[in-house]
């Protein structure tokens, strides 16, 4: 197991409508405890949301896999609402690796539940993709999350967000425990 310390800088562009944009720079793109870039990454996206709870967006990052994938594009949409003090978010995400034609692309149907600072997420992998379950808790700027990625392993992350002048910054620690199915544990 390797332990990682990340410095993430976020730049949010002001939005005068329901469309927003974001850009981030990170020392290593970590997703569910596993490195996706094996080094620095530049990331960004565009989001649309309206008052009904509907949202949609696109997000991208550079990645570095040994099979030739050099970029990731995620397309997503969903609907979020509150019911009896519980936040509910039902969404769909497509993960696309345009430079790779060996079947890395996959999709998930995601159900997120939240109450106060406590969150629970279920991601159901489609067409044979593994499922993922995560529980998270936040206390102010401090966040902790534990997830289990079927057939890959468990991950733990601890993060802290803060302001750097006019930017939102953060530090994160991530640890991954491999279940022995060939996951890249960084």
Describe the residue ranges of each PLM region:
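Outer-membrane beta-barrel proteins
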Residues: 4-5, 15-186
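Repetitive helical segments and hydrophobic/amphipathic motifs
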Residues: 11-12
């Amino acid at each position: 197991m390797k332990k990682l310390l990340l410095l993430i800088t976020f730049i949010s562009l002001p939005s005068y409508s329901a469309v927003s944009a974001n850009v981030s720079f990170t020392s290593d793109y970590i997703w569910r405890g596993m490195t996706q870039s094996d080094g620095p990454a530049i990331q960004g996206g565009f989001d649309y949301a309206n008052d009904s709870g509907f949202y949609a967006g696109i997000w991208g990052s550079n990645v570095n896999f040994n099979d030739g994938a050099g970029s990731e594009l995620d397309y997503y949409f969903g609907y979020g609402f509150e019911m009896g003090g519980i936040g509910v978010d039902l969404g769909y995400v497509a993960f696309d690796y345009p430079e790779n034609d060996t079947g890395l692309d996959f999709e998930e149907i995601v159900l997120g539940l939240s109450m106060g600072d406590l969150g629970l997420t279920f991601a159901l992998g489609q067409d044979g993709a593994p499922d993922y379950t995560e529980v998270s808790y936040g206390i102010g700027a401090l966040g902790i999350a534990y997830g289990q990625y079927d057939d890959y392993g468990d991950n733990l992350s601890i993060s802290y967000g803060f302001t750097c002048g006019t930017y939102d910054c953060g530090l994160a620690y991530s640890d991954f425990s491999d279940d022995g199915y060939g996951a890249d544990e960084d």
